[in-house]
């Protein structure tokens, strides 16, 4: 909605102004700067004086028309006076339009500006700068566009300043090239904001900007930093197939509508810390080449990371997921960090990663974790509904039948899924399938006797059958054993070779702590009708006792 014009300021401008049309309500009158050699602005010059002034202009002339009110015909006369006969397009030198008012259509298409100053200008009609070229900077600070604005295919070889600009209707920056910095700090976009296929070679600054309608950045390229911190997207935020070649920051941004980053490429770091996604968050087929941070983010709507690829760590520390979540299938060449996150709805995680960290993660509904390669730390995780951790032997398959590519894990030979810790977990609703438990720390786990083990779940074993303690041979009966027992026995003065002392996080655990663990696992195996496994843990229980 177009905002009403503010009342005239009683304070005169910093330049000698025209003063035409003064009234008690407007003691300053026209604020247009004097045309050189005259005491009136361009709009209020006598016709003969205006014609003489325009006739004296040549392409590339510097002009100063600050505060001047322009009609469409007056602007057309000015641009015709500086039209370059070689190109057929107007060519302005350093141009000063600060605080001017363009009362009708402002047509600057294909104009070349050696320097453009449009600070605090009001465009009451539509404004078009399509295919314009702004050499040595373009300043639109605190400028108001009351109708549509078009910058399609414009080129900004220098910096472009749109800080606190107000676009009250739609604005199009399609296919624009910003070679310098593009600064839209605290800008307000009340209508649609179209930046499709725009190229930002310098920094793109949208910090604290407000997009009240849909914002399109599809296929845009950000070659330097992209800063959207504290930005608010009230409509859709569309960054599909956008490329971020340097760091991208969306810290504390708010997405009221859908946020779509499908097939986007983040070649460096991507920061979404403390961001809020109230609509759906789509990161399907998105590629993250650097560190990806979603810590303390809030996801109110649905979340998709199908076929997303992370070359390094991705962090969801203390993130909140309020609805159903489908994370994956995704592939991560580093760690997926979900520690402290809260999942309020049903969860399906399909993850191929080196490590999955879920320390103190809260699961408030059912959860299914399908994993490849990962070492999983589940210490002190909280879940009150069934939770299943399953190791997948083959690559994940998408809905269309295509396997998920795992190039970032191509050098990893061992595809086993290992559980590193279940300490502090209530295992009453936990199901483990086909996972390696040889490194798993169990002491401190509650209701371990209700743990369900399915498929092939492997434990560590005692050392090979014959070892020597000093000169005497020592025989070991082969059985399943806990990582804590390995650590404790390897720490004894009389330990034989084969016990593993390097069990990370085992701490000070002895027979008194291990005996109840063996007892609970024995019962779990007995309830699962696995008598040989139960016998192994019976021997462990007796040995600890």
Across the structure, where does each feature detected by a protein language model lie?
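Short Cys/His-rich metal-coordination motifs, predominantly Zn2+-binding knuckles/fingers
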Residues: 20-23, 30, 44
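Cytosolic-side membrane-insertion boundary helix
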Residues: 502-508, 532-545
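Cysteine-rich micro-motifs
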Residues: 35-44
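Conserved positions within tetratricopeptide repeat
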Residues: 452, 515, 519, 531-539
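Tandem repeat scaffolds
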Residues: 6-14, 18, 29-36, 52-512, ...
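Cys/His-rich zinc-coordinating "finger/knuckle" motifs
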Residues: 25, 37, 48
